[in-house]
Amino acid sequence: MRRRFRAESGGNGLAVLVLLALISVQQLLPVGTGRYFGTVGDWYSQHTAAAETLRQAMLESGRLIPQYLPLGGGSSGYDFAYYGLLRPDVLLGCLFPSVEMKDLVAGYALLGIYASGVLCFFWLKTCRIPIWFSFAGAALLVSSSAFYQAHNQIMFVNYMPFLILALWGIGRVFERKSPALLAVAVFLIAVHSFYYLPACLCAAGIYTIHLFLRGGKGNLCGGGGSLCGREGKKEKLRAAAGIGAGVVMAVGMAMILLLPVGLDILSTGKDAGKFAEEAFTAADPGLSGLLYSPYSCGMTALSLYCLLTAFWQKGSRFLAGALLLGTGVPAVSLVLNGFLYAREKILIPFVPLLALLCAETLWKLYKGELKHRPMLLLLCLGAALVSEWKPLMLLDTALLGIWILVQKGAAGRNAALKRYSCLLCLCFPGMFALAVNGAEFWEAQLRDLGISISTVSYLEQEDSRQDWYGQLGRESIAFDRNYRMEVLTDGFVNSNLARQDMPSRTSMYSSVSNSGYGTFFYDTMKNPIAYNNRVALAAGENPCFACFMGIRYVITKEGQVPEGYTPMERWGEYVLSENPRVRPVCYGAYDLMSLESFEKLEFPETLLALCSRGVVRETGDTEKLYSPGFWQEDPETFFAGDGVEKLLSLHGKKESFGISLEEPLSGKVLILQFQVESQNKGAAVISVNGIKNKLSSEKAPYPNGNHTFTYVMDTGDNLKELWIEASKGNYRVENLKIWLAEESLLHQEEISIPEAEPTVWGKGELFLGNVDMEKDGYFITSYPWREGYEILADGEAVEGEAVNTAFLGFPLDKGEHQIEISFEAPGYTVGKWISAGSFGIFGVLLLWGAAGKYRTAGKNIRKEERVR
């Protein structure tokens, strides 16, 4: 017995070491040296940047869940819960504030993959699957191309270790053990990725039904134990109750996150992109939800063959059928995505179940309990012929056929060949995972084969686009926090970065955001849409928007300082500049315009009205007559020479050129607008004086639909030329319009600037100060309107309303007033108490269970003593 234990322990150790080595090769080899385990796309601009901002807010407020963040004009902390509001790597960052968040996020993601592989191996062993077949299942799991998301869209897979623990916990309940492991695991899934929680619970439910149908965990792979007969029914009820209690307890503990997030999502919109408009078939013969794609389960033909083979066995038919149904019927993806779209990324939580079924099937094929069915290869071949990965899948299916022939030929003759060929069949999945993670190196070759794969380069360690953040933290600059700051250099990459010791920002990039503010940002203020989607709100050089939102400070590189701003600090290649003529964030206003009058205005007068008036629901008899400030220019006389022809003759050739103006412009706001139509549904990018607009390709995941390019710019003192940069493509430019207005009109509004005290946004404290109203008017802010604000004027509660189409304000009488504005996310208090109660009950149950074990042990000892 002891020798067997040592042999098994040695086998476990060797299997784990080989598994860790496999993961290291697959994940780290493509990264190489001098680069991060993370990509230059969303990983850098969204995930790590949002994590850093959350860390700063937690440290300043002393709270695990910051109520309000200084992004997007002011956002609920729950707007960023999609990226994992309580992720352990963010919390760890609070303990080690000097460690860069990039290092923590990358390290935690790698640790999650290693943990997923090792936990899967030991979980499969608890299912009575032998060591090397448990290793095979774990190897297939970590070879899934879905783990490409660990350095791209981290929330797609960062819950995986805890999903495996949840499945393990379900098995423990069937063994009459506590559901505590299940409860903790489900809670951690919710903390890491609430979006994937329903899909994970679906996977757990499928596994539970599978165990019920098998007669309990003991019968999972032919072991003892049964849930049959009268006693079996009682055991089923007990197991169902235990599993249900564990899940309910976990959801209750996570309610401080889930309830406010749910209300936040319901209060705003979510861009489903082109996927919402895509028609889907009743079934997907290419099984794109199962095979190859890193935005699906990402398995190979071996998994499909094992699924089809297992379907022929009674004990595995339900699990195999459920997985085939889930990955082959797009309607399942639609439901799990909350009816938003039918994207296969939501199926990734099924990967551990696929690993289980593959490991069990390979073992039974090896033992001879299941027979190879070469005819099933025809089904794999059929899927290959209609798959977008056709060349790769044909090769994969051919190798699979060779393996089957070797297995059948070695049956009863060469046991070693049969055993080792089972391990060799893992080579293709392992090599495929390596290829996907390093696809940037051979993207051209894949495209030559007709395989379209989205590749993003790994982040170079010397990347300096966020260096301003650390440099600003080392400076002692007296900012007026009743104004805002923007980063105009590399706006996309920096859109989610904000320090608590600097003014708030108007930019943000989150899949969940205030839809009213997003509409105002692009549709009302006509900020340039420079990226593939409208989710990224990255401010550019728009003088009307800067004035309205109070962008007093901007960070740029040398030579990129906008008109109207004066440099005040320099460090390295960055310049901090100031424009004190913009509006503050909060102020008293008297020049009011009714919403009805505003809605009668047309662009661009709407810009001027917002910058010179306060737009409120009703004004009574106090409204002044609005005088238009913009006038329209004739393009033929506005440009000198053939300037109009040059601009309208852009047809997709990459070029850069200058267009001279007929007369120099000084002290003006210039608006240039034209239509762009793509002839082949491709992308088009046109920059005017460094302001970039983009029409994204219709193949982009979330096309921006930006067919009207608008450029709002300050002419400065002597604008003589416009510099045009156009991208290559097949598009045409038409319907050119030009408007001008005096820049001074942006600053003519009569306002009262309050005296504000420092506040901590993470605690929900937005404004505390005094304002002296010279007459009756409105206290207007540029905090985006949403539910959750609390306003006190002279200690009395005041009801806020939407002003300036999308912001918070309220009427205020003449005189001096003390104003206090705070924010608490709807559902936060209720969720907090539910979580506190659930944690309390969970703790009591754990103590009760421990005490019960202690009492049972004591009884057994006393019983043995009496026997003696």
Give names to the regions the model predicted.
Residues H47-A51, S627-R868:
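Active-site-proximal, structured, solvent-exposed surfaces of multi-pass membrane proteins
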Residues A21-G117, A139-M160, I265-K270, E278-S293, ...:
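Membrane-interface coil-to-helix junctions
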Residues L19-I23, L110-C127, I131-L213, G242-G262, ...:
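Membrane-embedded helix bundles of polyisoprenyl
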Residues D79-Y82, P429-E460, E475-F545, R583, ...:
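Extracytoplasmic/lumenal acceptor-recognition loop(s) of multi-pass membrane glycoenzymes
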Residues Y78-Y83, K102-A115, F133, L140-I164, ...:
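Membrane-interface micro-motifs in multi-pass membrane enzymes
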Residues Y196, L319-S464, E816-G858, V867-R868:
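Contiguous transmembrane helix-bundle modules in multi-pass membrane proteins
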Residues C200-V248, L399-G409:
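Perimembrane helix-loop-helix junctions
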Residues S45, E52, A239-I348, D463-G470, ...:
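Periplasmic/ER-lumenal interhelical loops and adjacent helix-loop junctions
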